[in-house]
Amino acid sequence: MKHRYLPATEQDKKEMLKAIGAETIDELFADIPENVRFQKDYQIKKAKSETELTRELTKLAAKNKDAVTYASFLGAGVYDHYQPVIVDHVISRSEFYTAYTPYQPEISQGELQAIFEFQTMICELTGMDIANSSMYDGGTALAEAAMLASGHTKKKKIVISAAVHPESRDVLKTYAKGQYIEVVEVPAKNGVTDLEALEHAVCDETAAVIVQYPNFFGQIEPLKDIEPLAHKGNSQLIVSSNPLALGILTPPGAYGADIVVGDAQPFGIPAAFGGPHCGYFAVTKKLMRKVPGRLVGQTEDENGRRGFVLTLQAREQHIRRDKATSNICSNQALNALAASAAMTALGKNGVKDMARQNILKADYARRQAEKAGLHVAFDGPIFNEFAVRLNLPVKEANRRLLQDGIIGGYDLGLAYPELNQHMLIAVTELRTKEKIDSLIARLGDQHE
């Protein structure tokens, strides 16, 4: 174990060069012209012992401002939620942790059952008939939903609310460009989709209408009013939803949604820089054969024993590449398992209580903000986020908050120029009354 971190020692290199008949490394790469070779010093630091390396990395990690040491009010699509301890124990089991898409499902029954349970729980939350095994993230799921709607309706226009997550809208535009699909954005009014503008935007050429519930500003969109407008001209209604919110809100399926997508990050997946996340994708039965990604089904073997299989695989790229419903050929099975473990540990009542705490704490924070003289940007019901207008740049406000051990909210001006100096504040079940009061007090002091 003397050289356990070295892929090849000097002796190893000599033996390999001898085996291929080369004297030196330069001789090995003789076919590469001198003028294109990298000639500079790599500037790699001198090797360290394991103890020295651990000490250096620990010192670097201490520079991070994490949600354990600091009270985080940053959301905007990634949230600091309670993670049941059991989640890491479940996903760390070797039979799950090292597993990839089970192409031999008959020998991966545990993996398939775990995915099947994930699909079942997503269906219960969304009120939909069928859910797939997962997608890369919420943005990818939304874009894939738009592609499904376009293919199903044979139309090339997608209408999307400006109150949908800006990064999801960017992903959609990337997908749409290659498919020659027109993306039309409908403005928001008082924090929710402008219904009058939506009505004017939808026409006979519209494949789908996309809204977010709760939306990017934390507001609860009026799906009951949006549904008839969305279905005008036989277009599809796509709803992007925070799955935790669906533990207490009326599910999109009850309002007539055709496709419900979102990100399962609130369940068992920590807020980490860049992910990974876990998208979910649920549809009505009529769209079952057009769903992207893997589908796990329950069946019986010849002896009557329950079993699980990958079903309807003719939709998939590895079976019929030229006629596949999507070019997505993988999923986030491990993160889907984490979400399943978290939802199972919480139970139905636990999910509902967790969602209720988000609503109550965010509402308390919003009321306290108003009392402190802060301008709350939008009226109407919210889930766990709300926007306030500040008298100084959000970046500066967050710098000051950080000095007091608080990670502030998202700068809405980054995505919405008209909302310059507006901060989007997220309040989850982990934030205490003391920390909420501390945040509002400091923002109030800065506001004066």
Swiss-Prot record:
**What species was this sequence derived from?**
Bacillus velezensis (strain DSM 23117 / BGSC 10A6 / LMG 26770 / FZB42)
**Job description of the protein:** The glycine cleavage system catalyzes the degradation of glycine. The P protein binds the alpha-amino group of glycine through its pyridoxal phosphate cofactor; CO(2) is released and the remaining methylamine moiety is then transferred to the lipoamide cofactor of the H protein.
Keyword Cell inner membrane listed? The answer is: no
- Name the domain of life this protein comes from: Bacteria
Alphabetical keyword list: Oxidoreductase
Family membership? Belongs to the GcvP family. N-terminal subunit subfamily.
Q: Which CDD domains match?
A: GDC-P (cd00613)
Concerning Gene3D superfamilies, the annotation shows: Aspartate Aminotransferase, domain 1, Type I PLP-dependent aspartate aminotransferase-like (Major domain)
What reaction does this catalyse?
N(6)-[(R)-lipoyl]-L-lysyl-[glycine-cleavage complex H protein] + glycine + H(+) = N(6)-[(R)-S(8)-aminomethyldihydrolipoyl]-L-lysyl-[glycine-cleavage complex H protein] + CO2
- Name of protein: Probable glycine dehydrogenase (decarboxylating) subunit 1
